[in-house]
Amino acid sequence: EIETKTDKKSRKGNKKEAGSGRKKKKSGFKRFLIAVALILVFLAAGLYVLVGKVYAEMNYEEIESVASSPMKEEGVTNILLIGNDSRENGEDGRSDAMILLSISNKTKKIYMTSLLRDMYVEIPGHKDNRLNAAYSYGGAELLMETIEQNFDIHISRYVLVNFEAFANLVDAVGGVDLELTGKEVEYVNGYLVEYNILLGRPEGTDYFDDLSGGMVHLNGPQALAYCRNRYIGTDFGRTERQRKVLTEVIHKLPKGVLTNPKGLIDGLMPNLTTNLTQAECYRLSLMAPKILTYDIIPVSYTHLTLPTNREV
C-alpha cells in the first residue's frame, strides 16, 4: 500500500499523543509522590506537636553524668523502669520494682529483666546494701551507676513511675486478664485494705468476692496489689508477676492509645519522671509501631545474657 501524506500526518500525531500521555503519566506520578511526601511531613509535624504536648505533662529530670550518652548502643536501647515505693505513711521511697527494658532491633525482641531489689550490692560512695537502697541514697542516677558497676550493664535512660501511675496505666488499657491462684486473690484483697485507706477510697472498693482463683480480670488497683505480693514465691514470684502484668499492658497498649489516649496521658504522664529528652521520645514514638510487634522475652536473672552479650 502507498502511504499518503494524510496517513503520515496521522501517524506523527499519534506518536505525539502517546508521548504526551507518557509525560502526563510521569507528571501525575510525580505529583502523587509529592502529595504523599507532604502528607508524611504534615503527619510527622503533627506527631511532633503531639509528643511535645504529652512531654510537657511529664516530669523531666536531666542527669548530667549520662546526658551525652547515646540512647541506643549496638542496636539495643536499654531503659530502666523504676517503680517508686514512696507513700504518705512515711516509707523511705526505695525502688519497689526495677525492670530493665532492652529493645533489640537486631533480634526483633523486647527483653524484660527483673532486678531483685534485695540483692546485696556495692553502692558507689556508700556501704554495701540492698540494690533498692541505691535509689533512696541518690535517686535514679545512683541506681543506674550501681547497676552498671555491679553487673556491667550500661544504662543511661530511665522512666520512674509511682503506684498511682501504674494503676492508672492498667486502667487506661482496660485492665488485664491473668490466671491467679486462690491465695493470690486473697492477697489482692488484703493489699487493697491499705491502698483504699491511703487514697481515701471507701472500704471494700475493688475487693474480690470470689476467692477461688482462675482466670481473673484485674483493674489498675487490683493489678498493683497483685504485683506487690512478695509473700507467695518470695521476690522471685513477685518479679514474675510484675513482668506478667507489664507484658499484658504492652500487648494492649496500641489499642489503648487509639481508644483512650486522654486516659493514658492524664493518668500516667503527671506521675512519670524520666531523663528521656523530647527528641528521644519523638524517635521512640516513630519506632513504636514496629517495636510493639516484637516478641517480649522475660529474662531469667539466675543466668542472664543480655542482647549486648554481657552476662550477670
Q: At which residue positions do the language-model features occur?
A:
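Conserved small/polar residues in nucleotide/adenosyl-binding loops
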Residues: 302-308
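Extracytoplasmic/secreted envelope proteins and their assembly/folding machinery
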Residues: 97, 128, 140-148, 163-167, ...
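Second-shell loop/turn segments in exported
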Residues: 88-89, 129-137, 152-157, 228-237, ...
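N-terminal targeting leaders characterized by basic, low-complexity, disordered sequences
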Residues: 1-20
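Amphipathic, coiled-coil-like alpha-helical scaffolding segments used for oligomerization/assembly
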Residues: 137-201, 255, 275-281
